[in-house]
Amino acid sequence: MDSWLKRAARLLTSISFGSDGSASVVPYYPQKVRVYGEEKKYFRRTIPEHFGISSKRLFNMLSELEGERRANIHNLFVLAGGEVICECSRDGYGTNIWHLSHSMSKTVTGMAIGMLVDDGRLKVTDRLVNIFPEVPYKDKRFADITVRHLLSMQTGVPFAEAGSVTEVGWTEAFFSSSLKFAPGESFSYNSMNSYILSKIVTRLTGMTLSAFLDERLFSPLGITNYFWEIGPEGVEKGGWGLFLSPESWAKIGYMFLSGGVFEDRRILSEEWIEESSTRWATSPMSTGDFNYAYQMWVGRESEEILFNGMLGQNVWICPKNNIVVVVNCGNNELFQMSPALDIIRKYLGCDIEDALSHSDIRTLHEREAHFFDSRRWVRPLEKKRGLLYFLHLRSRESFDIRWSDILGEYVLAKNNAGILPLFVTGMQNNLDTVIERISLSRAGESLVFSFTESGVDYSLEVGLYEYKSTVLDFRGEKYAVSVMGEALTDRDGVGEYRIEFLFPEMPNTRMIKIKPDAAGRITVTLSEVPNDKIVDLLIKKVPNQNGVAGFVLDMLERRFGEGFIQKKLEEIFSPTIVGADVTHPDAEKIMEEELRRVEDESGVVRLIRSVVARFFKESVGISEARATEQTSSEADGKSSDKRGFFSSILGKIKKRR
């Protein structure tokens, strides 16, 4: 088994069951070191009726999107004929604020390759080993990998996304991989293919990918606010990590729809537009209604083009209707299997022959202004009205006295939680987090939330009438955050206090729910969106991608019962932490009781960790190929010994439970 797979298993175990030291398996370094600046508006705003599309159609589309519970939309931006006919953002976000694109980044990297091909500096038939002759490789078939194989996800290289947080030498790990299949033989989506494309741009131009694209794409399109995270080798990640605003993405999509031209300036050749949007690989039906081209998706049975990133980031191009749609979401979804995208395609990808009525225009504008308000997790208070408030003789935003019952300082029990969502800290390798204390205080008419995380003190205002924005620095990474709180009472009359942390640059949101009792104890539940459901989708793919890891998951389910993995995921992504009011006489007793409970669980945790650690030791000598290619009879024979090992260890765990 490749060493990066073993480290990935160790990392997953540390996240799932805790660790004795740092959860990270490679050194941490800050990657997101900037926050957004607003992009200027470029496109003309108009009414959809100018293009034969009714406002009623768009109103119905927005209503259906808001009613689809699986859709968690942040921004929506619709172009028709190069003009904006619909634009809306959920409260706290904005179409001119950059947003993490995830795998939509790949499309821009692919365009950079196209520019090199247009320049005559590169051919898609060039072999990778000739571009990087100094890097050794093990598998003889690796010599056959071409630029086209990288573009179309047909390299057969298994070193993939998980390796980004287990290795620092990404290029060496990529080249030293044993291929899953001969290059060009099959389709296997892998973001590291895109990273190597990024390295090719740097190798051939002597420039960073960002600098090259600033000259050839961003500046010509008037895109001034962008950011691309850098990998451990000093090169842009290529396949992910690009931050662009919806309006900027709309420019790129419209340029592509216009045959590679923007404002009469050619950005990409017609030949590259045609070649890069041609199907080069047939993707599994499980990925959706699109096949794969060059770092983008193309309709199986239509001319639609899709730039897609996980969690619901999409640029959808419909040549038939001359439409470009940009949508940012925080959805539990991989690839382009998206209920939100399905709704957009339903309304805007069909033959449109609308009856037009200007009476619908105002209704659409009101819908845009209050988009997704019905889906709020916290609801703002209404600002006070009246002459005295209008004249500013009284504050329109007075303090909500319901928060008075929770004001104070609280120490929290041992945990591995952080204000940043786990999905973000995992991707950024920023895993060494612990919230040690929290406090809530009143400052005039404002509510202030303070917390200590990993020894660093933070303090920010919680909006009660609207989101309050600031920037938080977590170990050198900078995140814009908008915060709002709401005081509620549950069915039993017990106070429940919610604080929502929106990260307008990210698909991810952190929610905190605090519930006190009369004995000085509080419970703090941290949840996030997207949540464990997205990881559950990934885990379901594990048995097909890694036979050994699949066996481990199967044995845990066998011993602890069906649903064990899902329950553990829920605990990881939505932990509940016990805390105590530092001024309460029983505070020390509360924390001692919680410490004993944690210690009782730690023995079980250590045994589970030892199971996985021992299973992945090199001495076991089980290769990926042997685990996945053996016949069913061989599998039965081999697995009996493994089950004996698991039975001896997991039997002890079951007794201790």
Where are these regions (language model features)?
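A small/polar active-site loop signature that marks catalytic segments
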Residues: 155-189, 193-230
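Peripheral terminal and inter-domain segments
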Residues: 2, 363-643, 649-657
